[in-house]
């Protein structure tokens, strides 16, 4: 089954929601994102989906994860 341009996987949709959260809340470079539990609640998804979405955002250069500290806007 081919994915059409309009259909996006849940982690991709969640990454877009997180981008919207960043822009909608005026977060700047260096600001810390909420933790996985909070992002899951904000986005209405599970933590594993949030983790996948964060990986996409890391790959795109939007955020960086500092182990033991959190996820920060890049």
Question: What feature does the model see in each segment?
Answer:
Residues 1-74:
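Short linear motifs at protein or domain termini
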